Amino acid sequence: MAKVHRLMNAVLRLAAAAAAATAAVVMVTSRETTSFFGIQMEAKYSYTPSFIFFVVAYAVAAAYSLLVLAVPAGSALSRLALTTDVVLGMVLAGAVASAGAISDIAKNGNSHAGWLPVCGQIHAYCNHVMAALIAGFVALAVHFVVVMYSLHIVTDVICPCH
């Protein structure tokens, strides 16, 4: 049974790492230059702090998911990994939420604040960011499954009640 747990944990963590890395890479590669009323305008992820937070959070999540593969199941370190998984999940949720909020403003603007939508001028950039957000939500969902599975494994070690 321990081998099955270890294999399942490895598969889930590899999936989480792949999804998180994909989200970060797609966001990093989002860039477009366009002309708007004769003014050259460039859109890059690095111009928006929320997008930078997204990239850093998801890159850290990808690296962390790979590093935790080396942690032996049932050890005290695995309990620490579970706690770190929960914290990382909260960071990922915050990152995708903040990037999503900025994307919504870019797409729809905010009439109350007088902010105009910009996605009409930079379609490819906005679509690229949307793809990164979708990958981010997938990574967050997979990470949630990792947390639930890790919790199951840790509680089985503490109290094998079945």
UniProtKB/Swiss-Prot annotation:
Primary site of residence: membrane
Subcellular location: Cell membrane
Protein's name in the database: CASP-like protein BLE3
Membrane topology value: Multi-pass membrane protein
Keyword Transmembrane helix: yes
Family named by the database record: Belongs to the Casparian strip membrane proteins (CASP) family.
Protein's GO biological process: multicellular organism growth; response to auxin; response to brassinosteroid; unidimensional cell growth
Subunit record text: Homodimer and heterodimers.
Residue ranges, Extracellular side: 29-50, 107-128
Summary of the function given for this chain in its UniProt record: Involved in cell elongation in rice through dual regulation by brassinolide and auxin.
Keywords assigned by UniProt, alphabetized: Cell membrane, Developmental protein, Membrane, Transmembrane, Transmembrane helix
Tissue: Mainly expressed in roots and leaf sheaths. Detected in shoot apical meristem, organ primordia, including branch root primordia, and vascular tissues.
Gene: BLE3
Domain of life: Eukaryota
Keyword Membrane: yes
GO cellular component, one term: plasma membrane
Record topological domains on the Cytoplasmic side: 1-7, 72-85, 150-162
Cited Pfam families: CASP_dom
Induction pattern: By brassinolide (BL) and auxin (IAA), synergistically.
Transmembrane region(s): 8-28, 51-71, 86-106, 129-149
